[in-house]
Design a protein with these regions (language model features):
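Helix-start (N-cap) detector for alpha-helical repeat units in TPR-like alpha-solenoids
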Residues: 37-38, 71-72, 105-106, 139-142, ...
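Residue-level recognition of tetratricopeptide repeat
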Residues: 45, 79, 113, 150, ...
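Register position in tetratricopeptide repeats
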Residues: 49-50, 83-84, 117-118, 154, ...
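Structural signature of tandem alpha-helical TPR/SEL1-like repeats
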Residues: 50-59, 84-96, 118-130, 159-169, ...
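Canonical positions in the second alpha-helix
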Residues: 62-63, 96-97, 130-131, 173, ...
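Structural marker of alpha-solenoid helical repeat scaffolds
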Residues: 66, 100, 134-137, 176-177, ...
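Terminal, low-structured helical/coil segments at or just beyond the last alpha-helical repeat
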Residues: 160-161, 179-182, 187, 194-195, ...
């Protein structure tokens, strides 16, 4: 199944191309170097989803040599930096991607997630709240709601956790995606567990597991969550 992140990025690229070139089909008439850079970005995004970070990095670096301000390349490189633990560099690329194209909401979501990893919890929550207040496209709104739900259900700093709001956000995200996104359903399960509703948590975790096309990694994670909920335990919070 194509990830929500991939769908949102593709949608954003199409929106950007439409704004810049007037219509999507005009891509075939863009300068050769621009087409080459976008093709490299597409390849890098695909390789990153497959876990081939080294190849993704080579392609995105090549794209940025062609056009140092190409926001999709900056966003993808930010994802690579995050995987490498280079959080400050990732944030810099998110900032620049947003400067080049303020509509790249995915860069803002990635930045919020990185801030959570850096324990900048107040800044992360502010970013989620701001994004949701913008009422972005449905797919992007669902992602923002689900990410905020995860934050409020699992934040290592208990003062930022809000189980009831997390459940509300996660249900809204699942509804937007008509209950077809397994990761969002799992987030709802985690949020229910945070409130102590382990029966609902187990039910939603089982629902996420039953989705067709889930990755082996996600299946492993969902099974671990289900086992915890059946024992009436929350997922461990990483300090």
């Amino acid at each position: 199944m194509i990830s929500i992140r991939a769908i949102a990025l593709f949608t954003a690229i199409i929106t950007w191309l439409t704004a810049v070139y007037g219509s999507v089909p005009i891509i075939v008439n863009t300068p050769r170097h621009q087409r080459a850079a976008m093709n490299l970005c597409s390849d890098a995004s695909h390789q990153l989803r497959k876990g081939d970070v080294a190849s993704a990095k080579r392609n995105v670096d090549a794209a940025l040599r062609i056009d140092p301000k190409l926001w999709p390349a900056l966003y993808i490189r930010a994802e690579i930096f995050r995987k490498e633990g280079k959080y400050e560099l990732a944030i810099q690329d998110c900032n620049e991607a947003l400067r080049q194209y303020p509509g790249c909401v995915e860069a803002s979501l990635l930045r919020a997630s990185i801030k959570m990893q850096l324990r900048q919890y107040e800044e992360a929550l502010k970013e989620y709240n701001y994004l949701i207040s913008l009422h972005p496209r449905p797919v992007t709104l669902a992602r923002a709601l689900s990410d905020r739900a995860w934050f409020q259900a699992t934040c290592p700093n208990a003062s930022f956790r809000n189980g009831q709001q997390a459940v509300k956000d996660a249900k809204a995200a699942c509804s937007i995606m008509v209950w077809k996104d397994e990761s969002m359903i799992d987030t709802l399960a985690v949020a229910c567990a945070e409130t102590g509703d382990f029966d609902s948590a187990a039910r939603y975790a089982a629902q996420a597991l039953a989705m067709k096309g889930i990755s082996a990694h996600d299946e492993k994670v969902f099974r671990e969550h289900l086992a915890l909920f059946q024992q009436r335990k929350r997922i461990p919070v990483t300090q």
